[in-house]
């Protein structure tokens, strides 16, 4: 696999002119790289001056609205994959009819199916009344239930929830999670409300969603997002199970990200950040990509910067630190800190819990200037959308941008990064760890049993029986006078013998999902000569998978 990736990537670095004059050599190179009998590629291809990336979308406005931004990325991927989708249709239709069918389904995929806008009153603790605004967007129901988080923010808007819902559709498709995309937002600043008021808002919002059919284990399953967590998810589950879902045995599957006592799953809190780590790991250990960037594989000598020290930023920082990378700067909305010798994530977490801010952390200095432009190897924007724009993209010094947040890079900035040979690991792949583990939690709730409970003891006993069998076989063959030949397992194997916990199973499933999806993205990038344009490769994969569902299910009532 590594040789194939490395050699085929040489072609993706070729400029458009070189590719145009060597179309016959393209197939030869890919076949040769796979080990198939074919003529070796011409050396000139490997020496092309510039990489090639998708030019399917013309220049757009510098900072488009969020939903149009996602639509632009979708259009880029759709224009590249359209011919293949037409070619793969096995019908008796003419070429024109096939193309019309493909374009029709692509038009079905693109827009948001449903958007619910809500307003409801609450009485605050001081006796005053306030009207709360909220939204829930369901982008696609090609798979049900729909899946997407609920965020509490004063920046919530219809455009934002539509954009985030569409990203969820493509995100689920990229990592093969069988959900449609959705997103919700409540337009409040949670810091301005008491816990009692937040509970009122959350429970009332749940009831409004339920009345309109926008929540349910098989309909629409929310999850935590910005400024929400286990507590809010527990309120949602309890509200649904106590009212509209009181006859439904699967009622607690109406939401994920719950506390363990309410049907949650071990490993969900850190899932998105752990997914970010695994996503970076898959690309940073790929020698062919690192050679393009002029870097060595592995985390050992790498520095990184995190923008946003929330759930995603903290856990991303924690895992990268654990595997040898050094965090030299952390930024939040109220300021940034910097230490070239490294910042310990546990110490910074404890300091923030105690003081409410990272500013004043004794083992780092205040950082003047934009944290996004700090000198580092890996930049992790884990805050909010549209942080990297046309104006600051030329000054970004990182070689790898790992999108922990949703939509942190605008199309114009994305184009600049590609021209500057900077690798952007896209959001729809990189932060899919959360929805992946949410899927595991949803399955756990439907099965009504935790992972491994039925097999823990059986597997542990089987391992011990295997060791005893090996020991007895050795003693019969080599033992003298009935002497024993003890079999001593290593510490790592001893941990395995003791049986995998639910967290071990979740972590293993997440790592496998991220690795498999990364390989799919790499293969697609090579197939379409996209070079470092991993975002378009991810969108191509997502579009192909969603298209296949619509095409094979058939389009009803048209």
UniProtKB/Swiss-Prot annotation:
The UniProt record lists the keyword Transmembrane: no
Keywords: Acetylation, ADP-ribosylation, ATP-binding, Disease variant, Endoplasmic reticulum, GTP-binding, Hydroxylation, Mitochondrion, NADP, Nucleotide-binding, Oxidoreductase, Phosphoprotein, Transit peptide
Protein EC: 1.4.1.3
Subcellular compartments: Mitochondrion; Endoplasmic reticulum
Keyword Methyltransferase: no
Reactions this protein catalyses: L-glutamate + NAD(+) + H2O = 2-oxoglutarate + NH4(+) + NADH + H(+); L-glutamate + NADP(+) + H2O = 2-oxoglutarate + NH4(+) + NADPH + H(+)
GO cellular component annotations of the record: cytoplasm; endoplasmic reticulum; mitochondrial matrix; mitochondrion
Record text on activity regulation: Subject to allosteric regulation. Activated by ADP. Inhibited by GTP and ATP. ADP can occupy the NADH binding site and activate the enzyme. Inhibited by SIRT4. Inhibited by HADH.
Effect of residue 322 to C: In HHF6; diminished sensitivity to GTP
Listed name of the protein: Glutamate dehydrogenase 1, mitochondrial
This protein's encoding gene: GLUD1
Binding site for substrate: 147, 171, 438
Residue numbers binding ADP: 450, 516
């Amino acid at each position: 696999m590594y040789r194939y990736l490395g050699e085929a990537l040489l072609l993706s670095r070729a400029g458009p002119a070189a590719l145009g004059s060597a179309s016959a050599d393209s197939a030869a190179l890919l076949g040769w790289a796979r080990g198939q009998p074919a003529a070796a590629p011409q050396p000139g291809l490997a020496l092309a001056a510039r990489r090639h990336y998708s030019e399917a979308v013309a220049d757009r406005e510098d900072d488009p609205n969020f939903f149009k931004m996602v639509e632009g990325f979708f259009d880029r991927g759709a224009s590249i994959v359209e011919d293949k989708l037409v070619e793969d249709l096995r019908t008796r239709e003419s070429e024109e009819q096939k193309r019309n069918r493909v374009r029709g389904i692509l038009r079905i995929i693109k827009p948001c199916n449903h958007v619910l806008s809500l307003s409801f009153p609450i009485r605050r603790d001081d006796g005053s009344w306030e009207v709360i605004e909220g939204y829930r967007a369901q982008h696609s129901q090609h798979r049900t239930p729909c899946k997407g988080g609920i965020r509490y923010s004063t920046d919530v808007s219809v455009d934002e929830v539509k954009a985030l819902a569409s990203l969820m559709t493509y995100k689920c498709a990229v990592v093969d999670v069988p959900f449609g995309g959705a997103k919700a937002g409540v337009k409040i600043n949670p810091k301005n409300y008491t816990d009692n008021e937040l509970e009122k808002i959350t429970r009332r919002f749940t009831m409004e969603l339920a009345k309109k059919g926008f929540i349910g284990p098989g309909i629409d399953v929310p999850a935590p997002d910005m400024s929400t967590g286990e507590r809010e998810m527990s309120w949602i589950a309890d509200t649904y199970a106590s009212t509209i879902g009181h006859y439904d045995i699967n009622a607690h599957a109406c939401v994920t990200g719950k506390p363990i006592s309410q049907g949650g799953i071990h490993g969900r809190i850190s899932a998105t950040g752990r997914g970010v780590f695994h996503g970076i790991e898959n690309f940073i250990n790929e020698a062919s990509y690192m050679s393009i960037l002029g870097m060595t594989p592995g985390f050992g000598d790498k520095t990184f910067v995190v923008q946003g020290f929330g759930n995603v930023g903290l856990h991303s920082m924690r895992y990268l630190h654990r595997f040898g990378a050094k965090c030299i700067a952390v930024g939040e909305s109220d300021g940034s800190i910097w230490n070239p010798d490294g910042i310990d994530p546990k110490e910074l977490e404890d300091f923030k819990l105690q003081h409410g801010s990272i500013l004043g952390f004794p083992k780092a200095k205040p950082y003047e200037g934009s944290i996004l432009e700090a000198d580092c190897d890996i930049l992790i924007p884990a805050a909010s959308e549209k942080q990297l724009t046309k104006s600051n993209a030329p000054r970004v010094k990182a070689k790898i941008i790992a999108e922990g947040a949703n939509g942190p890079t605008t199309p114009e900035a994305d184009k600049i990064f590609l021209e500057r040979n900077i690798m952007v690991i896209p959001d729809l792949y990189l932060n899919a760890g959360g929805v992946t583990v949410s899927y595991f939690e949803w399955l756990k709730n439907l099965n009504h049993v935790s992972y491994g409970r039925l097999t823990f003891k059986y597997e542990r006993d089987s391992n011990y029986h295997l060791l005893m069998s090996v020991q007895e076989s050795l003693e019969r063959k080599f033992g003298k006078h009935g002497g024993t030949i003890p079999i001593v397992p290593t510490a790592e194997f001893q941990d395995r013998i003791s049986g995998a916990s639910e967290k071990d199973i979740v972590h293993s499933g997440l790592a496998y999902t991220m690795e498999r999806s990364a390989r799919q993205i790499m293969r697609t990038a090579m197939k379409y000569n996209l070079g470092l344009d991993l975002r378009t490769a991810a969108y191509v994969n997502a579009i192909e998978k969603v298209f296949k569902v619509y095409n094979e299910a058939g389009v009803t009532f048209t």
